[in-house]
Amino acid sequence: MIRFALNENIDRDLWDAAVMQSSQPMVYAMSWYLDLVAPGWDGLVEDDYQSVMPLVGAKKFGIHYLFQPPFCQQHGVFGKGISTDIVKNFLRAIPRKYRFAEIMLNESDTIDIPGVEMLTNITLQLDRDIENIRSGYN
């Protein structure tokens, strides 16, 4: 079951462990990094931190919304064995108080939902040796 967790109720160790178990662990979703770039961030948590999704919200003119914080290229669902269905379930679990969202999901979170715009993202895979990386360039 996916639940909304306020910042002060998030277990930082379990959160970070879920991020690190992801097929694409990213510093952008680590609790210490979020504390620096988006103080007061909240999150969605599946079961006992099996999967997690950071939520960075604000309020303007009485309207709550989600946004991508500065210095965070991607957010999305982090955990072990993330599927398209899990991503959709997380998106459905975003509290209704957020009337608008402009967030960048993980590059592996490819979903087809009306109103969701897919954008091109270019990443450099650093888990290869330097010669392999160089061979991809002219």
Report residues per predicted region.
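Short amphipathic alpha-helix that is part of the acyltransferase structural core
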Residues: 1-28
